[in-house]
Amino acid sequence: MIRVGIAGAAGYTAGELIRVLISHPQVELRYLQSESHRGESVGRVHRDLIYMNLKFSDLDLTDIDVLFLCMGHGMSAQFLERHPVPASVRIIDLSHDFRLKSNAGDFVYGLPELNRERIRGAWHVANPGCFATAIELGLLPLAKSGLPPAHVSVFGITGATGAGQKPTEETHYSHRAQNLSVYKVFSHQHLAEIREILAGQDEDVQADIAFVPVRGCHARGIMINAVFASERDLSEIRSMYAACYEGHPFTVMSDEPVYLKQVVNTNYCFVHVEQQDRNVLVTSVIDNLLKGASGQAVQNMNLMFGLEETAGLGLKASYF
């Protein structure tokens, strides 16, 4: 059994991670650390887990095989400075602290559809961001093709859980319900990793992306619509996408338009491509807390420990 510790275990991504791991056939949850809830029942914070006999506790880093860091951005690096982790313990970080090459050190970027083999041999993995996952999976086949578009316009809408557990004016029900709002236009923090990953596939790729993120009024799920011009015909583009994701169990090409409820509460990414004249539309949908965070973290753990990539991730979509 894989002995697991989670640091920062009280937030949304940690809650989803716990929910997935308690049903994982090869996992034993050893330590759930939360400085603000030390000694409390996990069910007092994650209210659907009141049936579990789990408590928040301090970590014993010598008694685990893998450490998940579910901490705020900037806090994972600080945690690792204060708490040296034994060399025998693998680390999966869900913050943005180690995603960019300038800060990565020996952390491997944890997008299995791109880095599956590197993840298999990794001891430290940086889990991608939620918007980054959806956009990269929507555009990666283009970057790999050698003929990427000169410019891509991306419109993305995300659920309220993408903002985290701490309430703010923008996440308050009276503001978010029955409302849409743009934010961080052309400057979202995930753009840096998106550009770096897409450009890394070909030295000629410029990764010119204009990204407009939108706060949705739903709880969870991301939809990305990417538009670009291409001289290729639709069948060629779809074939390119199918070839890129062949053998990757969680990224699925759809001939029909996709929608959020197909993937909410799952680790899947569904991708659909349409074309009219030279205009191409790529739509990708994911659950921001699963394929965009905790589910992908478990997928990476499975690869790191030589397990079936899908272990513990046979999750049911809500659908309706």
Spell out what each predicted region is.
Residues 1-185, 202-204, 274-276, 319:
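N-terminal Rossmann-like NAD(P) cofactor-binding subdomain of oxidoreductases
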Residues 18, 136-143, 191-195, 242, ...:
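Predominant activation on well-ordered alpha-helical scaffold segments within soluble catalytic domains
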Residues 122-125, 180, 221-225, 281:
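Short, solvent-exposed beta-strand edge segments and adjacent coil->beta transition regions
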Residues 183-186, 214-217, 259-263:
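Short Gly/Pro-enriched turn/cap motifs at secondary-structure boundaries
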Residues 187-253:
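C-terminal substrate-binding/catalytic lobe of Rossmann-fold NAD(P)-dependent dehydrogenases
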Residues 227-320:
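C-terminal active-site/capping subdomain that shapes the small-molecule cofactor and substrate pocket
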